[in-house]
């Protein structure tokens, strides 16, 4: 059958349209950015710590600035053959592989979106942070202060890891036991693990965790006894082996530390310079009986009136008449930072900035900020470096040196300067 000329022209035109369409589709696919076709992380950027969204698939989590009578040590049992590796803070400056110019531009844009979305980012903060109210930036903010806080975290983790590598080389091969995690509190909704260091803001941190867990609407509503004697927050050692290891490997682990001499003086002032129904009879009586010559009958009966040099004698005595207490124990013993890879290390001296940066990192509600009020003895001045020096001036140079030696690992791991020029 012979086709008419008009029919042939129509067939040719239709074939041309199909060919042009196929060629255009191939060209479009070849130019499309592969990062837009598959949702994946940008090469070279490892977002290991991610702001946490609330989770409801796990159950929600006493004590210490309250005077709970519990031993520091607990019976241990093996949990694993090695310490679970923690997650690192995001590292936005890792090098990218060589790419075409158009692809590089799209990757850079996508990278910025990821940084803004996932990493309100952290370098050394001055010991005296600004008195101006801290306004927590939203997820879309990435200003210079935020970057500085991110770099601070990187530096603190580096110093801590170097100290562990130098002095605790065997720690990474030890198994995690319930004793190692007995001071860690769990907040399941935002997947947070907080290691409690007494006299370093722990009361207010537990208030924050209770608000995060939905147990209170405001930190101001939570009384001291509720914080320390309630059972609202769970400790990590109350979970079974699988629950402990799961949380250690997937939750954001953080601790806050304080200059060791200031923390020690703060504990002494709180426990021995104010009426206390536990520390005076348990610790005070033993200290006075051992270290005060000709102690009065009344002092031996009540345990009140312990002086700072007597307290330091007890602290440094290898044959103490009464055991250690978490309020003046080493952070390296309380939180095992050479065994547990903490994601965030905050400092009491820069508490407001560090705490609110951490809250932004885990995507806490915008109206939740770290409380500024003093938990106990609110009319009394906080223990500062100046006040700590006044107390340590009561000691001999040898006692100061021995106390520094006692806390040497805490000074080293958390990069605190020597508080006295004659220390070595």
UniProtKB/Swiss-Prot annotation:
It is found in: Golgi apparatus membrane. One of its GO terms (cellular component) is membrane. Its EC number is 2.8.2.-. The keyword Transmembrane helix applies. The chain crosses the membrane at residues 11-31. Changing residue 77 to W: Found in a family showing features of non-inflammatory peeling skin syndrome segregating as a recessive trait; uncertain significance; results in decreased enzyme activity; the mutant protein shows reduced glycosylation. It is an enzyme of class 2 (transferase). Keywords: Carbohydrate metabolism, Glycoprotein, Golgi apparatus, Membrane, Signal-anchor, Transferase, Transmembrane, Transmembrane helix. Residues 66-77 have a biased composition (Basic and acidic residues). One of its GO terms (molecular function) is dermatan 4-sulfotransferase activity. Catalyzes the transfer of sulfate to position 4 of non-reducing N-acetylgalactosamine (GalNAc) residues in both N-glycans and O-glycans. Required for biosynthesis of glycoprotein hormones lutropin and thyrotropin, by mediating sulfation of their carbohydrate structures. Only active against terminal GalNAcbeta1,GalNAcbeta. Not active toward chondroitin. Belongs to the sulfotransferase 2 family. This is Carbohydrate sulfotransferase 8. It comes from Homo sapiens.
């Amino acid at each position: 059958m012979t086709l008419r000329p008009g029919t042939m022209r129509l067939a040719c035109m239709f074939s041309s349209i199909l060919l042009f369409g196929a060629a255009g589709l191939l060209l479009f696919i070849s130019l499309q950015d592969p990062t837009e076709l598959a949702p994946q992380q940008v090469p070279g950027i490892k977002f290991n710590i991610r702001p946490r969204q609330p989770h409801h698939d796990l159950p929600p989590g006493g004590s210490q600035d309250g005077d709970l009578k519990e031993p520091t040590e607990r019976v241990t049992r093996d949990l694993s053959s090695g310490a679970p590796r923690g997650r690192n803070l995001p590292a936005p400056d890792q090098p990218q592989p060589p790419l075409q110019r158009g692809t590089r531009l799209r990757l850079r844009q996508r990278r910025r979106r990821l940084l803004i979305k996932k990493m309100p980012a952290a370098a050394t903060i001055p010991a005296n942070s600004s008195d101006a109210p801290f306004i927590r930036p939203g997820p879309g903010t990435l200003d210079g202060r935020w970057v500085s806080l991110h770099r601070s975290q990187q530096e603190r983790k580096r110093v801590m890891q170097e100290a562990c590598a130098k002095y605790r080389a065997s720690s990474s091969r030890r198994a995690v036991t319930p004793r190692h995690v007995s001071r860690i509190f769990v907040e399941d909704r935002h997947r947070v693990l907080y290691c409690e260091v007494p006299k370093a803001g722990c009361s207010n941190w537990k208030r924050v965790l209770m608000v995060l867990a939905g147990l209170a609407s405001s930190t101001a509503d939570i009384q001291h006894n509720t914080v320390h004697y309630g059972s609202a927050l769970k400790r990590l050692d109350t979970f079974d082996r699988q629950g402990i290891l799961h949380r250690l490997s997937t939750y954001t682990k953080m601790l806050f530390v304080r200059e060791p001499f200031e923390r020690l003086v703060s504990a002494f002032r709180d426990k021995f310079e104010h009426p206390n129904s536990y520390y005076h009879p348990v610790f005070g009586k033993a200290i006075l009986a051992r270290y005060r010559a000709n102690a009065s009958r009344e002092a031996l009966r009540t345990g009140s009136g312990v002086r700072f040099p007597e307290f330091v004698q007890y602290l440094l005595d290898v044959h103490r008449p009464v055991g250690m207490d978490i309020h003046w124990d080493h952070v390296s013993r309380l939180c095992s930072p050479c065994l547990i890879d903490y994601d965030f290390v905050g400092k009491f001296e820069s508490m407001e900035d560090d705490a609110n940066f951490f809250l932004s990192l885990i995507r806490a509600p915008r109206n939740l900020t770290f409380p500024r009020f003093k938990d106990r003895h609110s009319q009394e001045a906080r223990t500062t470096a100046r006040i700590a020096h006044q107390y340590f001036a009561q000691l001999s140079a040898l006692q100061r040196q021995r106390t520094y030696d006692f806390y040497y690992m805490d000074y080293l791991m958390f990069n605190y300067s020597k508080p006295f020029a004659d220390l070595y």
